[in-house]
Swiss-Prot record:
<dbReference type="InterPro" id="IPR001763">
    <property type="entry name" value="Rhodanese-like_dom"/>
</dbReference>
<dbReference type="GO" id="GO:0005829">
    <property type="term" value="C:cytosol"/>
</dbReference>
<dbReference type="InterPro" id="IPR036873">
    <property type="entry name" value="Rhodanese-like_dom_sf"/>
</dbReference>
<feature type="domain" description="Rhodanese">
    <location>
        <begin position="50"/>
        <end position="143"/>
    </location>
</feature>
<dbReference type="Pfam" id="PF00581">
    <property type="entry name" value="Rhodanese"/>
</dbReference>
<feature type="modified residue" description="N6-acetyllysine">
    <location>
        <position position="91"/>
    </location>
</feature>
<keyword id="KW-0007">Acetylation</keyword>
<dbReference type="InterPro" id="IPR050229">
    <property type="entry name" value="GlpE_sulfurtransferase"/>
</dbReference>
<protein>
    <recommendedName>
        <fullName>Uncharacterized protein YibN</fullName>
    </recommendedName>
</protein>
């Protein structure tokens, strides 16, 4: 214990950085464990789409969506979800909803908004459309 105190005394900035990092990891872990939105793999997404008639919500810009999207996807912008302007998605509240974007990094907030709007099962696709395409899974062009 004495060595730890000496280290902290000699390296306060490094010690604060380590404590901040530890707190960030703990908060992130706690949030992911208590979140109603779960991150799923491409295999799990495929199973949900094929077996449970899941609906895919693509958050990318319209041009990116037209260049290639998962078959049957509904294109909604995060701002539309935030404003609760979900249109045709409204009738799918009881089905699993898979939220995707380009990389899977910007999906959590819109997915949480869908959960708050009453959607029962909301998932986020890990690595988004980039991971989907990287595994040579089918993409539909146009529309």
């Amino acid at each position: 214990m004495q060595e730890i105190m000496q280290f902290v005394g000699r390296h306060p900035i490094l010690s604060i950085a380590w404590i901040a990092l530890l707190v960030a990891v703990l908060v992130t872990t706690f949030k992911s464990l208590t979140s109603k939105v779960k991150v799923i793999t491409r295999g799990e997404a495929t199973r949900l789409i094929n077996k449970e008639d899941a609906v895919v919500v693509d958050l990318r810009q319209r041009d990116d969506f037209r260049k290639g999207h998962i078959a049957g996807s509904i294109n909604l912008l995060p701002s539309e979800i935030k404003a609760n302007n979900v249109g045709e998605l409204e009738k799918h509240k009881d089905k699993p909803v898979i939220v995707v974007d380009g990389s899977g990094m910007q999906c959590q907030e819109p997915a949480n908004a869908l959960t708050k709007a009453g959607f029962a099962q909301v998932f986020v696709l890990k690595e988004g459309v980039a991971g989907w395409a990287g595994e040579n899974l089918p993409l539909v062009r146009g529309k």
